[in-house]
Amino acid sequence: VKRPSEGINEGKTPAIGDAEARRLLAAPNPETLKGKRDKAILSTFLFHGLRCEELCQLRVKDITSRRGVIHLRVHGKGSKIRFVPAHPTALEAISDYLDMAGHRDDVNGALFRPLK
């Protein structure tokens, strides 16, 4: 029988610090479509804690308003749907990306798309 460890009970994946998160968000070139997309993706990951698959499944229509608060409609594991309040910084990055990409009106399309 093993005794439980007395150390910190953290997950296997280490968390990143504030300084590293700021460096990640500052890295993409804000003048290019790729840079705007990458900043929106990083912001969505960092501010909402989504899994890779959850981010890949996001559609434009998954940005919704509930009771006056903008949410992301996230399709999680086990076909569960949850509504995550959108962080203003991430929402601004997503909006900048959609404005430049020009697919805001394609509501059934993927939110984040590959670039040619």
Where are each of the predicted segments found?
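Conserved catalytic core of the tyrosine transesterase superfamily
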Residues: 1-116
